[in-house]
Design a protein with these regions (language model features):
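Envelope-exposed proteins and targeting segments
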Residues: 12, 30-32, 40, 48, ...
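Short, well-structured beta-strand-loop connectors
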Residues: 43-52, 86-102
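Short hydrophobic beta/alpha edge segments that flank linear recognition/processing sites
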Residues: 63-66, 93-108, 116
Length: 151
């Protein structure tokens, strides 16, 4: 998976409430994405540039799905739910573009969250792999060098 992500879907560095847990079989139990802490009404952003593949309700929850540009065939596709979409199918989006807001539903997480998924074709992948280390791990922190002798 290429690290094409340029922003987190919500916030600056949201808490991961539930991580990636791939199922052993296609229909087996598991977690096909990650749940990120996000309050209702928070802006949801495209992590990378692409085209809106789908925006609308699925099983009573709003979903936005984006095909990511330049990620091969079939292209990588991110999904975000529950989201009140501000985009429509076919819209081109840039990395960081607002695609909707987090809806208030309590059916997936114990607290307010957004489920972020990643697929290539019908295969689910870990969406955190889209984020380069500098974004995934947070900013670099310089430490003082007091007491360190100069060369």
């Amino acid at each position: 998976v290429p690290a094409v992500g340029r922003v987190w879907p919500v916030g600056v560095r949201p808490g991961v409430l539930r991580g990636w847990d791939p199922p052993a079989t296609v229909y087996g139990p598991g977690h096909r994405g990650v749940d990120l802490s996000a309050p209702p009404g928070a802006q949801v952003r495209a992590v990378a540039a692409g085209r809106v593949f789908f925006a609308g309700p699925v099983a009573g929850r709003g979903v936005v799905s984006i095909e990511l540009s330049g990620t091969g065939e079939p292209p990588l596709r991110t999904t975000y739910e529950p989201v009140r979409a501000s985009v429509k199918q076919g819209d081109e989006v840039t990395a960081g573009a607002v695609v909707g807001t987090v809806e208030a539903t309590g059916r997936h997480c114990e607290g307010p969250c957004i489920h972020w998924g990643l697929l290539r074709g019908k295969t689910y992948l870990n969406p955190l792999l889209l984020l380069p280390p500098w974004l995934l791990n947070g900013p670099t922190r310089l430490l003082p060098v007091l007491g360190v002798p100069l060369p």
